[in-house]
């Protein structure tokens, strides 16, 4: 399975990159951070994205991933009820895409 990490230079992102690299059944498709293009998720064939970015950027990242059929795992803190409702709305338009919100993975 091809997995990408957003926020790859942060503490949790770096741990996720290391774990993916150590797993025999996962392939790191992209390790992106501030300033990197999300288009790399599509060009690398990413199937799942793990987001350890910031509350300010997570929704844009989720929208991009979901619109491109990429499943998401969110480890970003600050995911409130309004963001959850927006995520549900995005997912309702893309029923084959899944999302897991786990904001305290540290």
Regions found by a protein language model. Give the residues of each.
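NAD(P)-binding Rossmann-fold cofactor-contacting core
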Residues: 19-40
């Amino acid at each position: 399975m091809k997995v990408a990490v957003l926020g790859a230079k942060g503490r949790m992102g770096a741990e996720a990159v290391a774990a993916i690299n150590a797993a025999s059944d996962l392939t790191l498709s992209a390790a992106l951070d501030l300033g990197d293009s999300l288009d790399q998720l599509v060009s690398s064939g990413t199937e799942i994205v793990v987001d350890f970015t910031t509350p300010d950027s997570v929704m844009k990242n989720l929208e991009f991933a979901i619109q491109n059929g990429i499943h998401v795992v969110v480890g970003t803190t600050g995911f409130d009820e309004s963001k959850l409702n927006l995520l549900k709305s995005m997912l309702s338009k893309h029923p084959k895409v899944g999302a897991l919100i786990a904001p305290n993975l540290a």
